[in-house]
Structure formats: C-alpha cells, structure tokens
Amino acid sequence: MMRKWLYSTNHKDIGTLYFMFGIWAGMVGTSLSLLIRAELGNPGSLIGDDQIYNTIVTAHAFIMIFFMVMPIMIGGFGNWLVPLMLGAPDMAFPRMNNMSFWLLPPSIMLLISSSIVENGAGTGWTVYPPLSSNIAHSGSSVDLAIFSLHLAGISSILGAVNFITTIINMRPNNMSLDQMPLFVWSVGITALLLLLSLPVLAGAITMLLTDRNLNTSFFDPAGGGDPILYQHLFWFFGHPEVYILILPGFGMISHIISQESGKKETFGCLGMIYAMMAIGLLGFVVWAHHMFTVGMDIDTRAYFTSATMIIAVPTGIKIFSWLATLHGTQINYSPSMLWSLGFVFLFTVGGLTGVILANSSIDVTLHDTYYVVAHFHYVLSMGAVFAIMGGFVHWYPLFTGLALNPYLLKIQFFTMFIGVNLTFFPQHFLGLAGMPRRYSDYPDTYTSWNIISSLGSYISLVATMLMLMIIWESLINKRIILFPLNMNSSIEWYQNLPPAEHSYNELPILSNF
C-alpha cells in the first residue's frame, strides 16, 4: 500500500492522487467562497474586518487556481490520458512525476499556515507591493504564501518538463504532430506556457521576499525601485496562467464533443491546433491589459487593447469548430454532452465580457469592480470547472471501470448550472453600477443583487455535494462497465476498464486512413 501510493511511478496512480488532492482542495476553496458570499449576502459586517475578509479571498483564489484547477486538469487528466492517448507505456520521467505531486501537499500546508499566523496574507492573489511589503504586512504571513507559491511553481515546472518530453519523445514511430489527439496538444501547449511563465513569477516573488526580509528595494521607490515593475513581472506570468487554466479544458471539450457527436474527429482538427498555438503565443504579449489604470502611455494602451482583442479570433475559431462538429448530429443529451454545451455557451459569454474589458478606456471605469469578477468567474467557474466536470463524468468509466448514475448526473448538472449563473450573472450589474472588488461591505444600493448572488452560491454548494454523493453512490454500487461506446479514433477506450497497471506492453501501430 505504501509503495503503491507514496512511492508510485505509475502515471495512472499519480493521476488518481492528483484527482483526490484536487477534489479535496476544491472543497476547501468552495468553503472559502461560501464564506465570501455569506459576508456579502447582506450589508454590514459578518466575519470581521477587511483583513480577515481579504485573507479569505486570497486563499480562495490560490487554492482554486494552484490546488484545484491545475492539479485536476494537468495532473489528473493529463497524467491519466496523455500516455493512454499517445500509446506510451508511461510518462517520460516517472519518478519526477511522483515528486511533482508530492510537492503540492507541503505547498498547500504553507498556504494554509500563512492564513493562520499573524494577521494572514490579505493581499489578494496578486500580492502587489506596497501592500505586501513588510510595513503594510508585517509578520511571516506573506513570506509563507511566497514559499507556498515557490513549491507549487517548482511542481508545475517539473510536470511541464515531463509532459513536453513525453509528447516529443514517446509518440508511436510514425505518428506526426498533426495526428496527435487534441487533448495531448492542449496539454503540451499548456506545459510550454508553464515552463516559460513560472520562472518570471518565481523571480518576482523572490525579489518581493528580499524586499521584505533582506532590505533590498526592488519595489520600493524610496530606494530607487518601482512597484509597477512587480506588476509587469507578475502579470507576465499571470496572464499566460489564465490560459494554462483553460487550455486543457479546450482539449477535453474537443474530445467529448467529437465523441458524443459520433464524428471520427473534431471539425477543423488542424485549425484547432493552430488556434491553441495562437492563443498560447498571444497570451504572452497582452499582460499589461491588467494594468490599464497604472498610467501607461496612450500608445501602449492602444497596443494592449488591440492585441487582447486579437485573442478573440483563435478562440472564436475554436467555438465555431465545436459548433461545426455538433452540426448534423442527433444530439444525445448525455451528462458529458450537457457539460460541453454549457461550456461552449457560458465560455462564450465570459469571452464577450473579456472583449469589453479589453477596451482600455472602458476598463478605466470597470477596473477593480465586480464586472471583472463576473468576467473571470464566467470563464473559470463555468469554463474550467464545466470542462473538469464534463471530462470527469466522460472518462470516469475509463478511470474506474464503473458507471455513474446518468439521471442523478443530469439533476446535478442543472442544479450547478442554475447555481453558478445565479451567482455570477448579477455581478455584471454590480460592476456596471460601480461596486468595487475586495471590500467586505458595500452601500445599501447594492443589496438586492448581492442577496441573489449569495443565494446562487448556496445552490452551487448543494450541487457540489450532490456530485460527491453521486461518486460515492457509484463506488458502493459498483455497476461495472461491459463495453465502452467509443469511436475508433479515441484509443484510450481500447484499454480494459479500468486499464491494467501497465497499459501498453508494445507500442500501437498507426495506420493511414
């Protein structure tokens, strides 16, 4: 038992560990988000002052990003599916794969420690100085958060190296890059983004660490530094990061839609690959659209506005290719199909509010209001999370060999759908009316929409608990899958369900069709 789970070098076992860790962290993050919505459910103070509130917000963001979405998408689905889809016996560096996982529990422990010592790190997930300096945040909270980020970053970089090596070196002999499954492509591009962006974050937070403890002044104007430098460094990581969070979701949705449509491949397969590459590349040249209010030159703002809008083009290509894949099929509203359709629609809504925010002139007004919160929660809470849910219910029979109850899954989908939309749609109105982010209290004008938003969060909580109940029900009833309804073009379903410990004893042969 100890050898299997602690010292594992098997991509499936490590993937399962990532899933268990991510689901646990997701429940912690959800609990924090409910604390936020409980505080905002009515005017006046509930939990305490803004420092406590902002500590909760900061922890919620870090946990959801670094310990829920990334471990599940890249660690869970990536580890499980990339070797199976490539026909590889395992990942390229199995022991490094194990280390990537085991760096995460210490990392989350450091993050939780940062909340419970001193006053907590109430900086927001961006950790901007001078608020995060040792004057405004004395004590070790921010330092612990920085070390937590270091560990999570090392974990992701090692994982990225592993995926890139696996994808380049462990394909079947005659499989060219354009024949690779879209999910493998999406994980490969994600890994490349991680590899290029995380070192910049590491540099920024290390400089912040020395500013706080070793008396340097990288971000302190009194010593010739500039806090804006930190913002540039952080967002040079932070913007690719949001594409890292969504790209594997794109890959999963492509697979689910083409398989559920009964098509042998996604419409415009090659275009999908180029679109993901374009999104990855453009993701690196638009970072300052997070900084339209710091007083940049007008030409700079014009450039970042237009460059940001260009990202909508490859994203649109993906949306329309998914719709074209669905075209002409008799749609079977299975749970995984419902999640995919929900993803396409709600991700599009989130993308449209993003295009609005890309206008620097409008963003000056909307920056740091709930409009921004609504925008990124539409693409994360209804993009990334819907993709995770869809991928999970789609590949669960492959991972476990068991069936989930489709009737309960549909009830769960509609509960969650109503919950998240009720939570985040009203926040657009709050933002347009000027309600600022990161405050625990607000003028009475904003009360009604906040009550509705908080109500939605309670519905989402019920949906989350329902999902856990469905998984539990499946595990105790053990409805064993007899045969998968797969297309010939998805080779992961040719395994036993669940797959054997060693799935490919010899490399599969690719035939031209």
UniProtKB/Swiss-Prot annotation:
Name any Gene Ontology BP term. Answer: mitochondrial electron transport, cytochrome c to oxygen
Topology of the protein relative to the lipid bilayer: Multi-pass membrane protein
Concerning SUPFAM superfamilies, the annotation shows:
Cytochrome c oxidase subunit I-like
What are the binding positions for Cu cation in this chain?
H239, H289, H290
Report a single Gene Ontology molecular function: metal ion binding
User: At which positions is Ca(2+) bound?
Assistant: E39, G44
Residues holding heme a3: H375
Residues annotated as binding Mg(2+) are H367, D368
Q: Which InterPro entries does the record associate with it?
A: Cyt_c_oxase-like_su1_dom, Cyt_c_oxase-like_su1_sf, Cyt_C_Oxase_1, Cyt_c_Oxase_su1_BS, Cyt_c_oxase_su1_dom
An example of a Gene Ontology cellular component annotation for this protein is: mitochondrial inner membrane
Query: Signal peptide position in this chain?
Result: none
Which residues are connected by disulfide bridges in this protein?
Answer: none
- Which subcellular locations apply to this protein? Mitochondrion inner membrane
> How does the cofactor attach, per the note?
Binds 2 heme A groups non-covalently per subunit.
- Give the Enzyme Commission number: 7.1.1.9
Q: Which cofactor does it need?
A: heme; Cu cation
Which controlled-vocabulary keywords does the entry list?
A: Calcium, Copper, Electron transport, Heme, Iron, Magnesium, Membrane, Metal-binding, Mitochondrion, Mitochondrion inner membrane, Respiratory chain, Translocase, Transmembrane, Transmembrane helix, Transport
User: Which sites bind O2?
Assistant: Y243
Membrane-spanning residues where?
A: 16-36, 62-82, 101-121, 144-164, 182-202, 233-253, 267-287, 304-324, 337-357, 384-404, 413-433, 451-471
Query: Does the keyword section mention Membrane?
Result: yes
Say what the protein does.
Component of the cytochrome c oxidase, the last enzyme in the mitochondrial electron transport chain which drives oxidative phosphorylation. The respiratory chain contains 3 multisubunit complexes succinate dehydrogenase (complex II, CII), ubiquinol-cytochrome c oxidoreductase (cytochrome b-c1 complex, complex III, CIII) and cytochrome c oxidase (complex IV, CIV), that cooperate to transfer electrons derived from NADH and succinate to molecular oxygen, creating an electrochemical gradient over the inner membrane that drives transmembrane transport and the ATP synthase.
Its subunit composition reads:
Component of the cytochrome c oxidase (complex IV, CIV), a multisubunit enzyme composed of a catalytic core of 3 subunits and several supernumerary subunits. The complex exists as a monomer or a dimer and forms supercomplexes (SCs) in the inner mitochondrial membrane with ubiquinol-cytochrome c oxidoreductase (cytochrome b-c1 complex, complex III, CIII).
Family that this chain belongs to = Belongs to the heme-copper respiratory oxidase family.
Q: Which protein are we looking at? A: Cytochrome c oxidase subunit 1
Name the source organism.
Choristoneura fumiferana
Name of encoding gene: COI
